[in-house]
Amino acid sequence: YPAIVSVFSVGVIIFIMVYVVPQFVQIYEDQGTQINGLTKFIINVSTFIMNYWYVGLLIIVLTVFVISLLYKHVKAFRASVQMFLMHLPVIKDVIIYNELTIFSKTFASLLKNNVFITDSMTILSKITNNEIYKNIMYETVNNIVKGNKISDSFKNHWAIPDVAYYMIVTGESTGELAEMMDKVSVYYQEMHRNIVNNLKSFIEPVMVTALSIIVGIIILAVIIPMFGMYEQIE
C-alpha cells in the first residue's frame, strides 16, 4: 500500500505541475500579473519538468544504478550503508529482527540435521547479505577453533539483542541449542511482523499528509497571484 500511495502521489504532483500550473501561467502572462517568489519557483519547477523531464529521469536512473552497483560489488560501501541503516531508529529493529529470524531458523535446521557448527556458520555467512552478521559468523568460527564458546561472538555485540544472546547461552549450556534457536526464530519473527505492521500504519497517514501539504502549497502558489490580478482589474 505505501508503494501505491507513493506512485499515486508522484503522479498527482506531476499532473498538477504539467497540466494545471501552465494554464495559470498563461493567464498571468496575458494579464501582466506580478508574480511572487513562491509562484516563480513553482513555475520554474513546472517548466523544468515539461522541458527537461528526461534529464531528471536520467539522473534518477543513473543514481539508482550506480548505488545498486556499488552496493552489490563493493563490500566497504555495502557495509557502510548497512551500518548507517542499522543505526536509524525503527529501521534498525526491522533489519535486526529479520536477520535474527533467518539466522536462528536456519541454524536450528542445520543443527537438527547434525551439521557441524563451523560448517553451519559458514553456510549462514553465505546466506546473509549483511556484512555485520557475516563478521559475527566468521568470528564464531574462529572462536570455536580456539576452543571458545559459540556465544562469545554474540556477547555485548550491538547487533545482537540481550534476549537473543541469553537464549543462545541457555541453549548452549543445556545442550538444547537447536530447540532454543527455534524459540529465537519464533520470537523475532513475531517481533519483526509487529514492527513492520506498525511502521506501515505510521507511514500511510504520513504520506497522505505530506501529499496534501505539497499539493496545497502548489495550489496556493498558483492562486495567490490571482488576487493581485483582480485588484488590477478593479
Describe the role of every protein-language-model region.
Residues 92-202:
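Glycine- and small-hydrophobic-enriched helix-loop-helix hairpins
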